[in-house]
Amino acid sequence: MSTIRSIHAREILDSRGNPTLEAEVILEDGSFGRAAVPSGASTGTKEAVELRDGDKTRYLGKGVRKAVDNVNTTIAAALKGFEATDQAGLDRRLIDLDGTENKGRLGANALLGVSMAAAHAAAASNKQALWQYLAARTGVTPSLPVPMMNIINGGAHADNNVDFQEFMVLPVGFTSFSEALRAGTEIFHSLKSVLKGHGLSTAVGDEGGFAPDFRSNVEALDTILEAIGKAGYTAGEDVLLGLDVASSEFFENGKYNLVGENKRLTSEQFVDFLADWAAQYPIITIEDGLAENDWAGWKLLTDRIGKKVQLVGDDLFVTNPKIFQEGIDSGTANAILIKVNQIGTLSETLEAIAMADRAGYAAVVSHRSGETEDTTIADIAVATTATQIKTGSLCRSDRVAKYNQLLRIEEALGAGARYAGRDAFVSLKR
């Protein structure tokens, strides 16, 4: 039987040394599922609430004992005997138990841990890998996503003077995920050599990318291009570039305050700034180019470069189907970033991806800066219409774990494995 026998949660540590919640679900047939919840550094104001204890004498107030207790008491009792394969029903039960719009009573971290662990247990009960189990339910032919590899960290993810949060390489000119991963890895090591040659730091940030001090944001792009060439690849053909601007982090009093450029720009000026970069460099994707509340600026950017550049809403949409629908209706952005903990259940995550597909928007499944060894997002990326995955750089085990899971999935798919490559940017084909 695939009904739930027991649910248990515990407090563990994430990749930044902060507590997070891990949940385990055991079914009556003995099947077992485990999942750990990620946590973000730069967060949208409309994200589901991550419940923290606030006790400054313990883990600097970041403990999650309250969320753990909510799982081990309220949620465990309510879901005992529930059919684990009814993911939508299980998640509705969790949402109803919480009873708030933002999941702030029990905590989105409590709900998500149980939601994902239940899916793992249900897959085990069906004797399937999670990606197989999810694909059977989404009706999607599994495929390997293009990795958006964050090889230079800035902003809230690093202690340096770079304003933009992520500078990424996307290895699109390859026929398999494993070859794309190899190219990204070789570029990463080439970048380390280039940075050393320029006398720059090779210390890494939260997501495993290098975090040197540059004289300007554009110097980061130029350095990456040098590394791509040194690794033997061609920018614009083998490899494209991506940015996570995370502009909400430096949007102050109606202006974009670029410390690295010594500039304070209006929305119109910042759109010009980004459009100029997109014209000069092989940039295929820009995430959070404008601040989450600057919808007028977002619309300007979309109208300006949205036919040639993938414009990803992260803080803008926070994986929330209701907010995302506003973007679809207004023609704002052309892609959505999918973060499981922004919305708080697996079903709502899958619905956001399906919404994107119906609207002709691309979906990018993403990690958070505070990660664990959990690889659920890799399975989600393969089993849905998401065509890209963001899971950091090519070092730190919390990031590499997802890449390794994708390698396992590619091997399991065998001759049927398909890598998205240049076809990943579905919103640019409309």
From Swiss-Prot:
Catalytic activity: (2R)-2-phosphoglycerate = phosphoenolpyruvate + H2O
Free-text remark on how the cofactor is bound: Binds a second Mg(2+) ion via substrate during catalysis.
Subcellular location(s) per record: Cytoplasm; Secreted; Cell surface
Required co-factors: Mg(2+)
InterPro entries according to UniProt: Enolase, Enolase-like_C_sf, Enolase-like_N, Enolase_C, Enolase_CS, Enolase_N
Enzyme class at the top of the EC tree: lyase
Residues reported to bind (2R)-2-phosphoglycerate: Q165, K339, R368, S369, K390
Documented EC number(s): 4.2.1.11
Function comment: Catalyzes the reversible conversion of 2-phosphoglycerate (2-PG) into phosphoenolpyruvate (PEP). It is essential for the degradation of carbohydrates via glycolysis.
Protein name, as recorded: Enolase
